[in-house]
């Protein structure tokens, strides 16, 4: 197995061609340069191992997908043999840890660290109808929510996330489904051209608090949307008045890259100042150890290890425990 076994040009050639045909030549050119750098100039040392795990997955036919259920579910009208089930398990285990999900591959249930379906259930009642919409999902992880968007009738879904293990987990689903209008690009938000103004809905869930400049992130998100487009923003918040924002001294819940946790009123002010309209908080929910926890598919530390063992309402650093708000707003 060599690095050449991962053919990034074959993987991403179709979406690069599509962007060119859609009049987004500047994005297509920039993306090709970024992917060349990612996979040729500085290839990740685990690419061959992850490709080997994908290659382990059995080839199956007569496949159906249920994308409107809690678990993104693949089924086959052709029953799997014992050997195929063993291959499937080995391949999927080779892509551990699985953090975002859950997924069900032909009866093999992947109980991921996060119950991402709970977040979807909180957000989805407040969304504009996704039917036919072109959607961007920023920080999409392995693409769980992208699949749920497709299940709601989205016309085109593009997820972006720099994590390459997430990319291969995404491939494990897409390779079974073939030509479906969904792609995951292994890039960061700042790698997108400014002012694309091409998406009907842009999601940014669990990203804002990782930004050193949250207002710049909001402006970047606004630039992805067409006029009248919808932003769906989910982030960590704290209780407090308008103008208040918590900046951790160092870590928050053992995470180093957490910068700003605003109050809900502060978050609404940020959206107003960055030019969004009709911003409203639609949900505020504490994250519990039922929603985020270690499992057989993610065996590392999880939320219970990041909370004060004597007071689970606080992080181990003494800050308020994780509280997540979802805000929806429009671009004028």
Give the ranges of each region predicted by the language model.
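N-terminal accessory regions of S-adenosyl-L-methionine
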Residues: 1-116, 175, 247-249, 268, ...
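Conserved class I S-adenosyl-L-methionine
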Residues: 133-141
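Conserved SAM-binding loop of SAM-dependent methyltransferases across substrates and taxa
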Residues: 142-153
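A short acidic, Gly/Pro-enriched loop at the edge of an enzyme's catalytic core
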Residues: 192-202
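A short SAM/SAH-binding and catalytic strip from SAM-dependent methyltransferases
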Residues: 200-214
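A short glycine-rich, Lys/Arg-flanked "PGG" loop and its adjoining helix->strand segment in the class I
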Residues: 215-230
